[in-house]
């Protein structure tokens, strides 16, 4: 008798990138009981070797192509900087590997289209890392929308805010990213997921350029948009990179409201439910050089370390990816590459509207 969720053979995993997310993915993969081979990579030799030692990787390299094409690698996680996803992802696809690309799928739309075309040509699965899908509160929205408690969705409102410390970390490593492409992307994905893949018809957006992030990097400090849909639905979504470094929610705060003909679901995700104040400053998990004496614990989007183990959405997403490769069973929560591409196109349309001040149709090339 065969069991569809039994992994008979081990799974070989390669992780490209040793930043906070790449390191976390590698540590999670190292702890997965079915991972029998682990390779890590970073373009900086010292970073690659240190991560390999930390997660007891079987091998490491400064060349992504070297590890993603290995015969003992089955699954590849691309967690390099946002503007360098394309080349290692393409190499992995062409080597016949199953690939998970951290959001955003790519920054340039033409690169995303090429990745999807290659995945189809080589017959491999490619996914996008939208970790928030695996958090209980956002999964609960999906389940209850599917069960009809909301009915036809009529409108939506959502916001996501980052601290300036996190924003500086993001923009300094990938100068071509934006608040929309990097951060509001989570809201675009969740909304499209709840709507069964329906995308907006138009986007109108405006952004602020009066704050510290714009002054330092030339990027918008915030972006606010209105999305309209062919069926009459409307959504108001916003992102801000303006919270002070010492803001107690040391990484991100989110709110999400979905309105329908039969009901409404509202999530207040600002982490005020677990508040700690201490004479000993608490370092931010994402930007450990930044500390605060009052902290809203749990505001690190991937999850948290406790008792030497990592718990939370990124662990569950990474496990879902590895399990899907090992069992051959598609995971129902993982975002596909096509879904990641759709979200990228919405993000790009919003940025184009903020740049031009015009309503931008989704038929815009991106």
Regions found by a protein language model. Name each.
Residues 131, 229, 247, 254-334, ...:
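C-terminal glycine/acidic-rich active-site capping loop/insertion
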Residues 1-55:
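N-terminal Rossmann-like dinucleotide-binding module
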Residues 1-10, 75-77, 113, 121, ...:
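C-terminal helix-rich "cap/oligomerization" subdomain common to oxidoreductases
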Residues 57-64:
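Conserved SAM-binding strand-loop segment of SAM-dependent methyltransferases
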Residues 61, 101, 126-128, 157, ...:
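Hydrophobic residues in well-ordered beta-strands that form the structural core
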Residues 21, 125, 132-219, 224-226, ...:
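Predominantly a Rossmann-like dinucleotide-binding segment in NAD(P)-dependent oxidoreductases
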Residues 182, 188-276, 318-327, 365-366:
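Contiguous beta-strand/loop segments that form the cofactor/metal-binding neighborhood of enzyme cores
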Residues 74-75, 81-82, 86-133, 148:
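Beta-strand-loop-alpha-helix segment that lines the small-molecule cofactor/substrate pocket
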